[in-house]
């Protein structure tokens, strides 16, 4: 079968969005500059914070986008302020490292309304370990540490609606309830792979009145109770011998957009985390998600099939 060909119909707009990704003013905007220093009165005793949460978030975002260390990010942002003749200073790298453990990095977009298809998947981000070339040539060492990034993506807009970072030993199904509870928007259907075919995931989707598009595992049995979505998928599997027809009739293949999101994460920001503390790694991962959503909002390709 010949490979399908597509043509981008909004190339001028998308091309400009790609160029803007390299603009420092795209990431260090007026909103961040105006709210750089903390203005709120502290609610507890102790030394007040000098820099706002938005300032710390902005530093973490720039660090991920341009793949800098914290020290390099400090020097980079200070030089930008100097060139712009703006009387601001970047937080010290040690301050950013400390504040990253407690900062709440907001990645949600102002988009509202119903979500037709929410697609869910996870990927690994390396914290410690050798590169793939060394593993291929000499084998892996015992100490390899990873974190799992869980994402829920709107298949129509490509925006990341929910995101979470967990330890490597947390399964996808265990992380699912906390992930899906991050949004209160109405969702028609949620699609995920067979790793989410557990009662825990189906119960959470039923509680939120979301149609479950999760393929049952091979040889799966019926579940008693109110699991109509899954039992229909099991019945289809038994009649046809596979999940292929069920996937086609339910539009399950839109779930590939979640894999596209994972690919964008790795290609744009790399596949590793650099902060040492786990809470800091959570902030670093959420800054990555915030940056990806900002890129998505700036412009995405719109394509039509031509062959």
Predicted regions and their residues:
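Short arginine-rich
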Residues: 84-87, 294
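Sequence-level motif detector for i,i+2 pairs with an aromatic at +2
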Residues: 3, 23, 113-115, 253
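Helix-centered, glycine/charged polyanion-binding patches within enzymatic domains
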Residues: 2-7, 194-267, 275
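Basic, amphipathic alpha-helical segments enriched in Lys/Arg and hydrophobic/aromatic residues
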Residues: 2, 53-65, 243-307
């Amino acid at each position: 079968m010949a490979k399908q060909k597509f043509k981008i119909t909004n190339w001028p707009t998308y091309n400009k969005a790609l160029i803007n990704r390299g603009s420092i003013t795209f990431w260090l905007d007026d909103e961040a500059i105006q709210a750089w220093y903390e203005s709120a009165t502290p609610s507890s005793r102790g030394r007040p914070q000098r820099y706002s949460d938005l300032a710390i978030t902005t530093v973490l975002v720039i660090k991920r986008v341009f793949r800098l260390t914290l020290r390099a990010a400090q020097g980079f942002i200070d030089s930008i302020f100097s060139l712009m003749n703006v009387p601001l200073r970047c937080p010290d790298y040690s301050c950013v490292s400390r504040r990253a453990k407690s900062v709440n990095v907001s990645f949600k977009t102002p988009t509202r309304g119903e979500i037709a298809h929410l697609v869910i998947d996870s990927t690994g981000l390396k914290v410690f370990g050798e590169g793939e070339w060394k593993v291929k040539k000499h084998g892996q060492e015992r100490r390899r540490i990873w974190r799992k990034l869980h994402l829920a993506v709107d298949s129509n807009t490509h925006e990341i609606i929910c995101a979470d970072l967990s330890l490597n030993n947390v399964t996808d199904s265990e992380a699912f309830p906390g992930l899906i509870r991050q949004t209160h928007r109405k969702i028609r259907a949620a699609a995920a792979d067979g790793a989410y075919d557990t009662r825990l995931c189906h119960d959470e989707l039923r509680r939120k009145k979301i149609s479950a598009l999760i393929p049952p595992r091979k040889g799966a049995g019926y579940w008693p109770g109110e699991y109509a979505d899954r039992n229909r998928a099991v019945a289809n599997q038994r009649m046809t011998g596979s999940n292929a027809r069920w996937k086609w009739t339910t539009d399950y293949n839109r779930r590939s957009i979640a894999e596209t999101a994972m690919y964008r994460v790795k290609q744009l920001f790399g596949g590793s985390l650099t902060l040492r503390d786990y809470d800091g790694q959570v902030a670093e991962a959420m800054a990555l998600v915030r940056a990806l959503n900002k890129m998505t909002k700036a412009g995405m390709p719109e394509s039509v099939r031509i062959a």
